[in-house]
Curated annotation (Swiss-Prot):
Entry annotated with the keyword Metal-binding: yes
Protein name in the entry: Polypeptide N-acetylgalactosaminyltransferase 4
Gene that this sequence comes from: gly-4
Keywords tagged on the record: Disulfide bond, Glycoprotein, Glycosyltransferase, Golgi apparatus, Lectin, Manganese, Membrane, Metal-binding, Signal-anchor, Transferase, Transmembrane, Transmembrane helix
Region feature Catalytic subdomain A, mapped onto this chain: 150-255
């Protein structure tokens, strides 16, 4: 029995030793990366292209690379027709122009502006290869692009019920003004135009591919379709009523060759909507926006103008782009998430892409030596499914939700009806922002657009005061007049009230007048007065639903004539006429 016990003890000892050696081995392996012998160094980091904006780790913390969400794409087989080329030897120079134009000419007695919101008679009278004035600055004519390793481009043009004459002039100007080796192809996307034959006829021209949407898709999804079939490494998006000027393409492609994360646009000259005269635009303009998220052109300030005039051929940093005409590396376009496919038709996508490019490590630039003329129409000749106002609010609301952080409250204050827009699911767009480790909107305002005036922060908390289904409303009344009650609409405005804890005042956000019901007279009607004339003793007691002033509570009762009376009365815990619901509104705080 004893030998057997000794034998078992020996085996146990051996197993224990093996176990201890195993633990030691695991520990050494796990710590070896941080215990390198002297003289041994980690492999060098790859060199970063100094021209490409980088996202350095913050606070010495290396963030892991996020997995990429799928590139937003559209199933072309389901809802798109690609027109066949049945004639093999047609070039843009041998295309039967007269036959093509005669099928859509304006006729005497017809409204010249109805179909296109520009003078079609004037457009039809022009030669499709007319000469336009060289609007470039003199220094641009001396720039040599021959030593820059430029990649070719696919030009993508979407159109919907475009006049044949303006569309053909657009296509011919691209061919005529672009070096053949840099223009791989033109992709036309017909967004379900009434005249299907336009696309079929243009598809016969070599180096043109024509897609037709089987239903109306809008510019955004049409452009993504065009990008999906594009074969060139650079995408150039153009509108369907433009004319390219001399050497318009080289500055765009050269800049992308230097900086693949630059999104570049030409200076957009003006083609007069009435007579089609070509007018050169100022090079001192750049893109901006206001807090309703409407794009606007703005003149550079004096400092920026001095810098531009000192380097007249250099790229112009622009906070936003108009969106109709720009070039981008296809790889960068896909990495950025193409377009937001849940936006509708047109509008707001240019600001969304502008924010995305800047905040995610790219740059947005206007190339002063690239000029393209554009017909700026005063109104849209086509309808927007769902209405143009609703479409624009949905699109801009999506942009604000994804990119503007706390500053979206400024947008919502300026466009209060946007609060009620169903903007859909933005999960995929937020995932793109997270994956690319994009910067904040605060960074964008400070580093890209410091010239934009930011509204002063609201001092205090903003409320909508509800009692039942009615809200306290200033009714746009003046000083010494009484506010009223009105159906709650949730859009702020006359129903937005601001409680300032510091000054102990309760004022209307629009009129800036304060509520006054502190009179010693019981049941005295509340009035609105200048805040500086009011004793600071207003308090919000949310748990009771009270708004108090001078020991009285704001009270509501309905008079004999059905009118609502609002006054100060002795506070009573069980008085429902004094129990307000303070609904906090989004504000920039």
């Amino acid at each position: 029995m004893l030998p057997r016990m000794l034998k078992m003890k020996t085996v146990g000892t051996v197993l224990a030793v093996i176990w201890l050696f195993g633990l030691a081995f695991i520990y050494v392996q796990s710590t070896s990366s941080s215990l390198r012998p002297p003289g041994r160094h980690p492999p060098p980091l790859p060199q970063l292209d100094p021209l490409i904006p980088q996202n350095p780790p913050q606070n010495d913390e290396i963030r892991p690379k996020k997995s990429a969400p799928p590139i937003p794409t559209i199933n072309l087989a389901e809802d798109t027709t690609i027109h066949e080329r049945t004639e093999k030897d047609v070039t843009w120079k041998t295309f039967d122009v007269e036959k093509f134009l005669n099928k859509g000419k304006w006729h005497q007695g017809e409204d010249k502006y109805k179909a296109n919101s520009f003078n079609q008679e004037a457009s039809d009278a022009l030669n499709p290869t007319r000469k336009i004035p060289d609007s470039r600055e003199p220094q641009c004519r001396d720039v040599d692009y021959s030593k820059v390793g430029m990649q070719p481009t696919t030009v993508i043009i979407t159109y919907h019920n475009e006049a044949r004459s303006s569309l053909l002039r657009t296509v011919f100007s691209v061919f005529n003004q672009s070096p053949e080796e840099l223009l791989l192809e033109i992709v036309l996307v017909d967004d379900n135009s009434q005249d299907v034959e336009i696309g079929k006829e243009l598809a016969q021209i070599q180096r043109i591919t024509v897609l037709r949407n089987n239903q109306r898709e809008g510019l955004i999804r049409s452009r993504v379709k065009g990008a999906q079939v594009a074969r060139a490494p650079v995408l150039t998006f153009l509108d369907s009523h433009i004319e390219c000027n001399q050497k318009w393409l080289e500055p765009l492609l050269a800049r992308i060759a230097e900086n693949p994360k630059a999104v570049v646009a030409p200076i957009i000259d003006v083609i007069n909507v009435d007579n089609f005269n070509y007018v050169g635009a100022s090079a001192d303009l750049r893109g901006g926006f206001d807090w309703t998220l409407v794009f606007r052109w703005e003149f550079m300030n004096e400092q920026l103008r001095k810098e531009r005039h000192a380097h007249p051929t250099a790229p112009i940093r622009s906070p936003t782009m108009a969106g109709g005409l720009f070039a981008i590396s296809k790889e960068w376009f896909n990495e950025l998430g193409t377009y937001d496919l849940d936006m509708e038709v047109w509008g707001g996508e240019n600001l969304e892409m502008s924010f995305r490019v800047w905040q995610c490590g790219g740059s947005l630039e206007i190339m002063p030596c690239s000029r393209v003329g554009h017909v700026f129409r005063k109104k849209h000749p086509y309808t927007f499914p769902g209405g143009s106002g609703n479409v624009f609010q949905k699109n801009t609301r999506r942009a604000a939700e994804v990119w503007m952080d706390e500053y979206k409250a400024i947008y919502l204050k300026n466009v209060p009806s946007a609060r009620f827009v169903n903007f859909g699911d933005i999960t995929d767009r937020l995932a793109i922002r997270d994956r690319l480790q994009c910067k904040s909107f605060k960074w964008y305002l400070e580093n890209v657009y410091p010239q934009l005036e930011i509204p002063r922060k609201t001092p205090g908390k903003s409320f909508q005061m509800k009692i039942g289904n009615l809200c306290l409303d200033s009714m746009a009344r003046k000083e010494s007049e009484a506010p009223g009650l009105f159906g709650c609409h949730g859009t702020g405005g006359n129903q937005e009230w601001v409680f300032d804890q510091l000054t102990k005042t309760f004022k209307n956000a629009i009129s800036q007048l304060c509520l006054d019901f502190s009179s010693n007279t019981e049941n005295k009607t509340v009035t609105m007065v200048k805040c500086e004339n009011l004793r600071p003793d207003t308090m919000v007691v949310e748990k009771n639903g009270w708004l108090t002033q001078g020991g009285k509570c704001l009270t509501v009762n309905q008079g004999s004539g059905g009118d609502w009376l609002i006054y100060g009365a002795h506070c009573e815990l069980n008085n429902g006429a004094q129990r307000w619901i303070f609904e906090k509104l989004d504000t920039y705080e």
